[in-house]
């Protein structure tokens, strides 16, 4: 039985899917105007683990995460780079897949894009206007916030509280300062689409509502994203979706905590803005993922090199213990005794499932993995080892690895295929021919680190595995 903290009710609740055995999940994705930063990586990793655990428990998960490819940030970037908005979006969507792929995030069931759903967005807005929940004003379309009775229920704010900070910007023709934009009138030189309200483009909030509705239906099981999206983005999504769909938008709302850099909020103005594209050149992506899951998803994370170093050491400890289990297999026997070890392994697995059932507590799940490694290190020192026990160790290691998404072997230690080695030898030969001896030495040293020895023969360079 899985329980999760529901932001909507501010308490942990037992998860009950709309459809037995199936989880419909929508996670707010990035605005693709740049490479993603580590703040974007956190929800990608956290909710990937949530998905993996549901799948481990036997659920079919329909996991939808969008790309915002029409936005003020993209338009500004377009002017800055003198490239079209679609060109910029394509570039950074490709980069997103590369970055989250390096972090071992599973591909979503679907990654809808705003530009691909423009017709549905326009129809959705028109239906809200027809029902009196929205109104057109000088080419813009606004949502009547006070028309929706439940506004503020996610962020637990009243309309009176919100009225204090609300204001009407220059050029806006709102009926009420609390109303928000569904459709923006086109400005000269900006990307735009034809609509019954005139040329323009959608507001940010309506985009997610429509894509979630198109992909998952009127009501979804789980809607997730960063804490910063809770208000106004998710609050506005609820209002426009429930006004349109006449049904609850999402039964459970999950929000992950922020990432601070050396105890300071990450921001461009402070110069501590860290892109995943850059950091994975210096930090093993597996270590970065392990670091992220070592903290509960709702808690804030403080990122610094010392803490990342601790995560690296912890992951090495787990991997080294697994390697010892594999090595001990070579001299194991078919012993029937030592059942107490099987019991201890299963107890740790039960501990892992218990903490993951409790709001996906990956921090305590990592502790269970450390306990398994400690038990494995103790077991390999026994005079005799059982094949059955070693296999059970490996099975549970694999469960932890699959659920948490952290490979048991680093990419550096994975065995190269013969054709990969031949390709590297060919690249080294080319480098030597071009007198790029630094690159030639780099390839030689990399192969040596993987216990592959190069030998010069009359027939050319050959290799052997050490």
Curated annotation (Swiss-Prot):
Any single Gene Ontology cellular-component annotation: cytosol
Residues spanned by motif 'KMSKS' region: 265-269
The protein's required cofactors: Zn(2+)
Ranges spanned by the short sequence motif 'HIGH' region, renumbered to the chain: 30-40
Catalyzed reactions per annotation: tRNA(Cys) + L-cysteine + ATP = L-cysteinyl-tRNA(Cys) + AMP + diphosphate
Binding site for ATP: 268
UniProt entry tagged with the keyword Protein biosynthesis: yes
Alphabetically ordered keywords of this record: Aminoacyl-tRNA synthetase, ATP-binding, Cytoplasm, Ligase, Metal-binding, Nucleotide-binding, Protein biosynthesis, Zinc
Disulfide bonds, paired cysteine numbers: none
Listed GO biological process terms: cysteinyl-tRNA aminoacylation
GO function terms (MF aspect): ATP binding; cysteine-tRNA ligase activity; zinc ion binding
Enzyme class: ligase
Subcellular location(s) per record: Cytoplasm
Listed EC numbers: 6.1.1.16
Cofactor: record remark: Binds 1 zinc ion per subunit.
Family stated for the protein in its record: Belongs to the class-I aminoacyl-tRNA synthetase family.
Stored HAMAP family: Cys_tRNA_synth (MF_00041)
Assembly behavior: Monomer.
PANTHER family for this protein: CYSTEINE--TRNA LIGASE, CYTOPLASMIC, CYSTEINYL-TRNA SYNTHETASE
Name of this protein: Cysteine--tRNA ligase
Organism of origin: Staphylococcus epidermidis (strain ATCC 35984 / DSM 28319 / BCRC 17069 / CCUG 31568 / BM 3577 / RP62A)
Source species taxonomy: Bacteria, Bacillati, Bacillota, Bacilli, Bacillales
Gene: cysS
